[in-house]
Amino acid sequence: AGGIIAGLSGVFKMAWDTDELITSFLISSALILIVDFIITGPMDDPTNNLLATSPIPLQYRFLKIYPTSKLDISLFFALFFAAGVYFFMNRTHWGYEMRMCGLNREFARYGGINVGKFMVIPMILSGGLHGLGGGFAILGTYDMCLKGFSGGMGWNGIAVALIAKNNPLAVIPAALFFAYLEAGAKAAMLHSDVTFEIAAIVQSVIFYLVTAQALYGLVSSKKRKAL
């Protein structure tokens, strides 16, 4: 489902050159409302005070690596997919063409690459992986489908990708670093006088410092294309 939804943004990009970030945000914003309605309506658990579905049966939940924490075997799936994406992007013909389309669309088109195809396929793949991430969260972290459980997950993914500079293997330490910031901010708010605003500012400053080089490179490449 995630791949199909993200694929729509790729189709819009191919047909009308729309910004895939904006279209995917608009589509997901509408679908989140529908999913929340289903969770709190037809699938709501009347025995639970939470706005959520019934708990996932134990036999379908992911095994915990540490019983006292929420860390589960989805970590190994994430490592596997990160390595798989790295291999696909750097060791296959399709991956090479996909990277060329991302680096310079006109150069790729001049080289005979079907640029339109590689506007849709990456969106389908990334949407599918994002859908898997949501499934892992339900089966491993929450053990049920909560209203708004995916809030901010997509933006976190963008932040991690910026920190990792779009390197699939670097996504692993980048995600751990980002999770450390998130957990540290929550712990600071719970165990000290640090407010949510202060924690958010500290996170933002660290994030901007880490991603400054990536943003500078993005702006520089756009200037070179304009010239």
Model-identified regions with their sequence ranges:
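Cytosolic-side transmembrane-helix boundaries in multi-pass membrane proteins
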Residues: L103, Y110-K117, A183-L227
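Short loop segments and helix-boundary regions at transmembrane helix junctions
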Residues: A1-N49, R91, G152, N156-P168
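Helix-loop-helix "hairpin" substructures at the membrane interface of multi-pass membrane proteins
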Residues: Y66-M144, P168-L169
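Transmembrane alpha-helical segments in multi-pass inner-membrane proteins
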Residues: I124-S204
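Terminal peptide-recognition signature
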Residues: F12, D19, A30, M98, ...
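Hydrophobic core segments of alpha-helical transmembrane domains in multi-pass membrane transport
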Residues: G2, S28-D36, S74-F87, S126-G134, ...
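Short, Lys/Arg-enriched, Gly/Pro-containing loop segments at transmembrane-helix junctions
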Residues: P46-L50, G95-M100, V219-L227
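Transmembrane helix-bundle core of multi-pass membrane transporters
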Residues: E20-R91, I198
